[in-house]
Design a protein with these regions (language model features):
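C-terminal alpha-helical cap of glycosyltransferases
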Residues: 383-404
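Conserved N-terminal ligand/cofactor-binding loop architecture of enzyme catalytic domains
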Residues: 43-125
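A short, well-ordered alpha-helix in the C-terminal region of glycosyltransferases
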Residues: 370-384
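Active-site and donor-binding regions of nucleotide-sugar-utilizing enzymes
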Residues: 40, 90-193, 198
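Donor-nucleotide binding loops and adjacent catalytic segments primarily
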Residues: 217-301
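C-terminal "capping" alpha-helix adjacent to the active site of nucleotide-linked donor transferases
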Residues: 344-347, 353-370
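A nucleotide-sugar donor-handling region in carbohydrate enzymes
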Residues: 176-234, 239
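Acidic donor-binding loop of glycosyltransferase active sites
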Residues: 300-313
Length: 404
């Protein structure tokens, strides 16, 4: 009888464990070539935590996972993500398509070692769902995952508005699900032979959840806080997390034209560029910003955005109801060229051949009728992708959807 009470307690504990099944685990593969992939991974982790879904989300840096097999590092001594970020900082993007194909060919050469390496990692992982927010390596990831976890789902979340085939985002691997942020990407998935059950389409690109928080920010108050005039039209220059040398050329042209304009210039982690701006005298009122997590708030102070046609920058501008001015030419990254087509199709901004035309582009944008049309078109867009993606994950995990 002395053992009966402890035994009953153990049985109660066992019953409680059975009532509360083990927490589902999601592993997200990302890298730091550009800032968008990490941003997507962190946004997913954040929104899932906020929704209290009972999932454990693990972020895995793909570059670190595969470092000793880094295919470009073997050729040049520099990591893939470092090469990419150096190209962006310096504007060395002419011929990027050819470089991209060299990278993809090299990845295919190292296909078997990559699959073996990844399979070894997945054997030590008890994830219930694998998510990739990176391009180029999805065939290797899909094959390795299938070897180790043939009954568990693998999904690629495309962080560009469209794919740049072949072997960029969408692969022929039967076990690859894809999440597309546009009808164009969904069409591309169907064209490669993806079954409809393996294609999910969201209402746009995923953004950080804080873009959706109630915000009563006063644009005029923010301008005053930044030392800008409250009544002047305000543009924002945003060229990714590392800035770009072209920003200096843009401001020089606008400054020389003496347009009735002021600018918020986001230099990101490019402190040298920020120091150059601060060290010059300008006719235009400028507010210079280095790296900041407040871009979403500063956007309230702007009337339009000038930037590179990255999917994240475009999506953030649309979320803040800002028309955009972009350029598209031989220097534009190949995977970002469709983004400019999307802007033209949706009539939400102006696409220039190059930023030497920036003065004319700004004048055109600020014409009252043009600006009003662009604002109406931007306002008509409704992007809820960050909340739609967890519902897709729930489906892939075999869980019920949550009502809105």
């Amino acid at each position: 009888m002395a053992w009966s009470v402890p035994c009953r307690r153990l049985q109660n504990i066992h019953n409680s464990v059975e009532q509360y099944p083990a927490m589902k685990k999601i592993q997200v593969l990302f890298h730091d070539a550009g800032g968008g992939h990490r941003n997507a991974a962190v946004a997913l982790q954040t929104v899932i935590s906020q929704q209290n879904r009972g999932w454990q989300v693990e972020l895995v840096q793909f570059q670190e996972l595969t470092d000793h097999l880094d295919v470009l590092r073997k050729l040049t001594g520099i990591r893939i993500q470092e090469q990419y970020n150096t190209l962006l900082r310096n504007g060395w993007t002419l011929g990027a398509t050819q470089l991209l194909r060299v990278l993809q060919t090299t990845i295919r050469i190292f296909h078997r070692p990559l699959v073996k390496l990844l399979a070894g990692h997945f054997r030590n992982s008890d994830a219930d769902l694998l998510v990739s927010v990176i391009p180029h390596f999805n065939q290797e990831i899909a094959e390795a995952w299938k070897l180790v976890h043939p009954d568990k789902a693998f999904v690629t979340l495309i962080t560009d508005i469209a794919d740049f085939p072949p072997h960029f985002w969408i692969e022929s691997a039967e076990n690859q699900y894809v999440i597309c942020g546009s009808e164009k990407a969904a069409q591309q998935a169907r064209a490669i032979g993806k079954n409809a059950t393996h294609i999910f389409q969201t209402s746009g690109m995923i953004l950080r959840p804080d873009f959706y928080l109630p915000d009563n920010s006063d644009p005029l108050a923010i301008r005053k806080e930044l030392g800008l005039q409250t009544v002047l039209p305000t543009g924002m220059l945003l060229f990714g997390g590392f800035g770009s040398k072209v920003m200096l050329e843009i401001v020089e042209q606008l400054d020389a034209a003496r347009l009735p304009l002021q600018l918020i210039v986001i230099c990101g982690r490019n402190e040298k560029l920020a120091e150059t701006f601060r060290g010059r005298k300008w006719n235009l009122p400028l507010h210079i910003v280095g790296f900041t997590k407040e871009v979403h708030r500063l956007m309230h102070a702007a009337n339009f955005l000038v930037g590179k046609p990255g999917p994240g920058s475009v999506a953030e501008a649309m979320m803040r109801k800002l028309p955009v001015i972009l350029e598209c030419n031989a220097w534009t990254l190949p995977q970002e060229r469709y983004n400019t087509e999307w802007v033209r199709e949706k009539r939400v901004g102006i696409v220039l051949r190059n930023f030497r035309q920036i003065v004319g582009g700004v004048k055109q944008l600020l014409e009252p009728a043009t600006l009003a049309e662009f604002r109406r078109n931007v306002a008509a867009l409704e992007n809820r992708a960050i909340f739609e993606v967890p519902e897709i994950f729930a489906k892939l995990l075999g869980e019920e959807s949550r009502p809105d």
